[in-house]
């Protein structure tokens, strides 16, 4: 989901001593599954002798709660989810950066198997055009905009085209907001501040670790 934003960090940073383990898309849709999969990856990294494990995730519907390592430092962004993470373009100054009614898109999300137009195609194939569109409309009832987050880390042209088609097919308005990958850059480069959770061995990630205090 955030592959473009992670790769952009390495364009300006020598991360030759960092091994990236990409994960399958879609785990964030099932927090319990996400918790299990990433915890197993933490155990695997421990066994491989990692001295630090950097987790490029947010709280993700409490999917991160309980992650732990007995022998290795864990570090991860102090954000509820990847959307908030990419909407924060400087130091974190509040917990929630989302705007009501917005369905957010980036390069990664437009390519995801659960992307809007893929979902629509699946609904149309399964239920037919009339019922499929009605079900999508009900599912998106609280949304008014499809919003592209321009993180500067991907070719925005195809994503704008995708967003235009989403807006047309789903009767939404389309707009663009500026974002970035600063929290991920802090995580990867080791420039850890209050925006990064750093957990010593034997500690467990808690929901309250993601609270914001000014």
Q: Where are the model-predicted features located?
A:
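Glycine-rich, highly charged phosphate/nucleotide-binding loops
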Residues: 31-45
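C-terminal accessory domains and tails appended to enzymatic cores
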Residues: 165, 171-214
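Extended, charge-rich low-complexity interaction segments
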Residues: 46-60, 106-120, 199-214
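Hydrophobic/aromatic-rich structural module bridging two neighboring secondary-structure elements via a short loop
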Residues: 49-85
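Long, charge-dense
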Residues: 70-117
């Amino acid at each position: 989901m955030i592959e473009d934003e992670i790769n952009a960090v390495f364009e300006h940073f020598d991360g030759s001593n960092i091994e990236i383990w990409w994960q399958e898309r879609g785990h964030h849709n099932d927090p319990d599954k996400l918790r299990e999969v990433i915890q197993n990856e933490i155990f695997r990294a421990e066994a491989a002798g990692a001295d630090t494990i950097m987790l490029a995730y947010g709280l993700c519907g409490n999917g991160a709660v309980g992650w732990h390592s007995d022998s290795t430092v864990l570090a991860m962004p102090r954000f509820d989810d990847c959307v908030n993470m990419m909407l924060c373009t400087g130091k974190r100054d509040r917990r929630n950066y989302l705007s009501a009614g917005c369905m957010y898109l980036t390069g990664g999300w437009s390519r995801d198997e659960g992307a809007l137009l893929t979902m629509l195609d699946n609904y149309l194939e399964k239920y037919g055009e009339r019922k499929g569109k009605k079900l999508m409309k009900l599912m998106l009832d609280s949304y008014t905009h499809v919003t592209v987050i321009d993180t500067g880390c991907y070719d925005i042209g195809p994503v704008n085209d995708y967003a235009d088609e989403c807006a047309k097919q789903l009767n939404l308005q389309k707009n663009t907001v500026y974002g970035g990958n600063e929290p991920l850059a802090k995580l990867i480069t080791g420039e850890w501040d209050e925006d990064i959770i750093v957990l010593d061995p034997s500690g467990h990630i808690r929901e309250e670790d993601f609270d914001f205090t000014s």
